[in-house]
């Protein structure tokens, strides 16, 4: 886990319908990605203290919220359910309790969670339960339910901050079949990210008319595995080829 979080400042100047003069709204956007169960400042595998965990990020975010209040947007970009013994315990042993990954995401008050390939790796019983336990929506516009033809989880969310309407679109690398057996993702298929982004950008712009569109993709910048069926790391392609994004955040490749 080389890259746990990124913080960006988005300053917007726009004309409010209720005001004659334009005004500037500053939003602090925080992304965490590829946490791999590093919730606490201790490595339970190697049995030693651990830096760069969500415990530290939580302190940082709490400090930001003192200044920016509700203008802090906190986004989790996948691969959170797997990686430490604490995850294994709640995924497969103490399955009656709420998953620790849900407790942490809820405690930190994330605005949205994106699916990662290692989240899919845990299997339906684990991630379907986890989705229900979260206070925020899980996003994955290109994760398609094969029975309905619709996204398996929410494709996007709308956030409102000081009159600014923000759309957040989430996607997952479609290379899942390269790594995981079908029993782990039965009833699902994974669409090409560029095609999916074009489709949902049109829907979002026509239906929601947002001031800002943020893409949050559990897919690397570029490269990775490329086959006739899928492209593993397509975040840069989406940013270049799909007009409308004000910010694109990516993960997966650490």
Named regions from a protein language model:
Residues 1-4:
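Positively charged n-region of N-terminal signal peptides that target proteins for export
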Residues 6-15:
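Bacterial N-terminal signal peptides
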Residues 20-254:
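Acidic, metal/ion-coordinating pockets
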